[in-house]
A protein has these predicted regions:
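N-terminal helix-turn-helix DNA-binding core of bacterial DNA-binding proteins
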Residues: 22-68, 155
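Short amphipathic alpha-helical/adjacent loop interface patches that line ligand
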Residues: 21, 65, 109, 120, ...
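C-terminal regulatory/oligomerization modules of transcriptional regulators
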Residues: 1-6, 130-155
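Pre-recognition alpha-helix immediately N-terminal to the DNA-recognition helix
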Residues: 12, 16, 43-47, 107
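Charged/polar positions within long, soluble alpha-helices
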Residues: 29, 110-117, 145-148, 152
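Charged, amphipathic alpha-helical coiled-coil/dimerization segments
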Residues: 25, 77-135
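N-terminal leader segment of winged-helix/HTH proteins
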Residues: 1-35, 82, 134
Length: 155
């Protein structure tokens, strides 16, 4: 007879993580879509809005979003086509190109954020008692710092 896997079994742990992630994305995705954004675009706009000068070097945006350089180029191409960001070359070092949030991008983000914030509040924050949420957030930061320390710019 096969023994039931324990809660600490690596496959069980990852299964729970994947199921939770997929479920949360399914609940949050309509808030992005209602504003003409994908989750990745929403993430990029938030990162730009919280950065000094509302801009990031393309390489830094790639690092923070976990995208390759070609992936972030495609992302910024889409955002630029929609008037949400512009590319700017650093006059002091022409090798650096920045993605900069436009007024239209800031406005779109401002329109999407209340609904997004409410969905995160409902589907994530309110699902746990405060002490468990605090423990989860601490654990997520430990894991994030171990796995992607370069992604810490906006937390």
């Amino acid at each position: 007879m096969t023994e039931a896997p324990s809660d600490r079994d690596p496959i069980t742990v990852m299964g729970l993580l994947f199921e939770t992630h997929e479920g949360l994305i399914a609940k949050l995705e309509p808030t992005w879509r209602d504003h003409g954004l994908s989750g990745l675009e929403m993430n990029a706009l938030q990162r730009l809005s919280r950065s000094p000068g509302r801009r990031l070097r393309m390489v830094d945006l790639a690092t923070q979003t976990g995208l390759s350089t070609s992936g972030v180029t495609r992302l910024v191409d889409r955002l630029q086509r929609n008037g949400l960001v512009v590319r700017e070359t650093d006059p002091a070092d022409r090798r650096n190109t920045y993605a900069t949030l436009t007024q239209e991008g800031d406005a779109r983000l401002g329109q999407a954020l209340p609904e997004y914030r409410a969905a995160v509040q409902h589907w994530f924050i309110e699902q746990l008692p405060p002490d468990q949420l605090d423990s989860l957030l601490a654990a997520l930061r430990i894991l994030r710092d171990a796995l992607r320390p370069e992604a810490t710019a906006i937390t």
